[in-house]
Amino acid sequence: MIQLKTINPDNWRLGLKVRSDQKQFVSDADRILARAFAYRNQRSRAFVIYDDETPIGMALFYDIEDAYNFSQFFIDERYQRKGFGYQAANLILRKMEQDGKYNKVILCYVEGDEAAKQLYLKLGFHHTGDDDDGEIGMEKMLR
């Protein structure tokens, strides 16, 4: 069963990583933690994604002006192509809905990352037309 656990002193150094050909598209675990700290005043929430008790990925979102920014998300190379990304992203979206502060989620993916693009489309995101130096903007309404 997929679950999210807030990053804490016991789970922040788990060695999670993506394939070498994916590194251009996603931040590594240390950078996600640094970003969570940098955005702490915007209520950043960083999670380790678990399949039962096995850590399989990481995610981060935080508040911006009028939306949640689903900033970082990856599944470890050993657990990809098993549907975990879709399940975990749905849990993140539910957390945002439960929080209830905003109705909108924004994110971006790096141009060329077809796996991310397809995942986000499947989750109901649509393109905004924003392109910030190869980062393609998407958004989704929660309610």
Walk through the language-model features, giving the residues of each.
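Acetyl-CoA-dependent GNAT
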Residues: 2-71, 76-78, 89, 95, ...
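Terminal substrate-recognition subdomain of acyl/acetyltransferases
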Residues: 136-143
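Conserved active-site tyrosine of GNAT-family acetyltransferases
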Residues: 120, 125
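Conserved glycine-rich acetyl-CoA-binding loop
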Residues: 76-90, 99, 111-118
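Conserved beta-strand-loop-alpha-helix junction that forms the acyl-donor binding cleft
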Residues: 106-117, 133-135
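Conserved GNAT acetyl-CoA-binding A-motif
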Residues: 96-108
